Amino acid sequence: MPNMSPTKVPMPQQDPNVRNKNFEEVATGYTAEMAMEEATRCINCKNRPCMTGCPVNVPIPGFIEQVAAGNFEKAYEIITSENALPAICGRVCPQENQCEGKCIRGIKGESVSIGRLERFVADYHMAHGAKAELNIEKNGKRVAVVGSGPAGITCAGELAKKGYDVTIFEALHKAGGVLSYGIPEFRLPKSLAAKELELSLIHI
C-alpha cells in the first residue's frame, strides 16, 4: 500500500556549524531505509506524468518501485537504460520544474522526491555495485565527439549503446565541462563527477 504521507522524507544535511567550515557536500543523502520509505510514496499512477517532465525519459515509476522493494541495483539498471549520469542528475537537475513538478502527489502535498531517490541509487551503485559489463555488438565504426560536457557525454553514451567505438576529445585538463568547472564542490563534488564519468565507459 502506498505511503500517503503528504511530505517528503527530509534530506539529511551537514549541521550549519560544521558546513560553515568546509566546502563538502551540504546534503549528505538518504540512507537505504529513508530511500525505501520515500519510494513508497509513489502511487504508480497510470498516466505517469513524471516521465513527461523528464528530458531523457527515465522510467521513473519502474525504478522507484525497485527502490521500494530494496532492489537498488535493479533500480540502477533501469535508470541507466536512459540516463548515463544519475548521480550527477540526481543532484543538479531542476527536478522541481521537471519530473517532480509533474508528480500527482504534489497536488495535495509534496511530490515524490525523485531526484533524491535517483541520487541514492547512483551513490549505492558506486559504493556497492560491480563495474558494468556491456554486451554490445560492435558495428565496426568509430565516432569522435568534441567536448566532454553533459551533451558530449550523453551523445557518446547513446552512440556507444548502438555499437560505435566512441572517443571524446576535450581541450581542458579535466573532462566534464560545466560539471567539473561550473558547479561548486558543496553542490557537486568533483570526485563524484569524475567517478560517474569513469563508470560511463567512454574513452576521453
Spans of model-derived segments:
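N-terminal Rossmann-like FAD-binding beta1-loop-alpha1 element of flavoenzymes
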Residues: 143-165
